[in-house]
Curated annotation (Swiss-Prot):
Belongs to the sterol desaturase family. GO terms for biological process: sterol biosynthetic process. GO terms for molecular function: C-5 sterol desaturase activity; iron ion binding. This is Delta(7)-sterol 5(6)-desaturase erg3C. Its cofactor is Fe cation. GO terms for cellular component: endoplasmic reticulum membrane; membrane. It comes from Aspergillus fumigatus (strain ATCC MYA-4609 / CBS 101355 / FGSC A1100 / Af293). Pfam families: FA_hydroxylase. A motif (Histidine box-3) lies at residues 259-263. The histidine box domains may contain the active site and/or be involved in metal ion binding. Keywords: Endoplasmic reticulum, Lipid biosynthesis, Lipid metabolism, Membrane, Oxidoreductase, Steroid biosynthesis, Steroid metabolism, Sterol biosynthesis, Sterol metabolism, Transmembrane, Transmembrane helix. It is a multi-pass membrane protein.
Length: 320
């Protein structure tokens, strides 16, 4: 977030705040009463940027995935809800501002220099850049695995995570269709990497590993920004319903096929990027062609006379 503000302050925000809160009215080229280090200005800037950024990423990549990857025949599945796409979009867009408010303290701590993010690659060298990327992915994967799995505990599930499982056969538009607290809690492993040890220890989430991690893993700030954005995109892509199976990468990567099975069977494939945590803790279920929800969708389409036995569209004569 500090990278974004450093870019946008001289480009747009300085002029915007000078217009809204001029230090001296009726003078040419006024400055703002709130300088760049003003905490109120930083709070407003962060909230505006996270709202615009999260919404733009969601709408752009969900649309790409929905129109170019998602198999629209899945919308005929018996468990696909009436007006589901509209509901998914509405749920996602309504959750984003609340998730942004909840994550505000961590972004604010980062902007105000309370993080372990560093500026130059030369500060720690290229080898650490690679190592920190691997550690970041591994840490987030195990953190989200256990947060996600705990959210499926009966005492928690119905209050926080159930809204996301309303979509048995999700589309990419369901990627952010969370209860806001659900989205926030699952984002904590990403945020914790950038917090200083003191700030991390004060966090409410009772996961000691998050506090320990920041003692050993500084991260280059541009790398963090890229990985953080990539995580949001990945969250969308794993909801595309693609049940490709038999590829050697499925042994290691928590693919859209794995996440499709999670939505269908609830207690499998809790991981975010990789399958190792599910495999080790006994919750892994490998994708199989027979488990593809498209089979049930095609049954409905055949009954309606929309496709033949091979799943090919039936062309009706003109005028019918």
């Amino acid at each position: 977030m500090d990278v974004a503000l450093e870019f946008l302050d001289p480009l747009i925000l300085d002029k915007a705040y000078a217009w809204l809160l001029p230090s001296e009215p009726n003078v040419p080229d006024p400055t703002s009463r709130w300088d760049r280090d003003n905490v109120y200005r930083q709070v407003i800037s962060i909230l505006v940027l996270t709202q615009l950024g999260a919404t733009s990423l969601y709408l752009f990549f969900s649309a790409l995935s929905y129109y170019f990857v998602f198999d629209r025949r899945l919308e005929y599945h018996p468990r696909f809800l009436p007006n589901q796409v509209r509901q998914e979009i509405k749920s996602s867009l309504s959750a984003i501002p609340f998730i942004n408010i909840l994550t505000l303290p961590w972004f604010l701590a980062e902007v105000r220099g309370k993080s372990m993010l560093y500026r130059s690659v030369s500060d720690y060298g290229w080898p650490w850049l690679v190592v920190s990327s691997i550690l970041y992915m591994a840490f987030n994967d195990i953190g989200i695995y256990w947060i996600h799995r705990l959210e499926h505990h009966p005492s928690v599930y119905k209050y926080i995570h159930k809204p996301h499982h309303k979509w048995i056969v999700p589309t990419p538009w369901a990627a952010l269709a969370f209860h806001p607290l659900d989205g926030y809690v699952q984002s904590l492993p990403y945020q914790s990497v950038s917090l200083s040890p003191v700030a991390a220890i004060l966090r409410a989430i009772p996961l000691t590993i998050n506090s320990v991690f920041v003692f050993i893993c500084p991260m280059q700030r541009h790398l963090y920004m890229v990985l953080f954005a990539a995580v949001q995109i990945w969250t969308i892509l794993i909801h595309d319903g693609d049940m490709i199976s038999g590829h050697w990468t499925e042994k290691f990567i928590n693919s859209p096929a794995h996440h499709t099975l999670h939505h269908m069977y609830f207690t499998v494939n809790y991981g975010q990027y990789f399958t190792w945590a599910d495999a080790y803790f006994g919750s892994h279920r490998a994708p199989e062609p027979a488990l593809d929800p498209l089979h049930d969708a095609l049954k409905v389409m055949r009954a309606k006379g929309l496709v033949d036995e091979q799943g090919n569209p039936i062309k009706k004569p003109k005028g019918e």
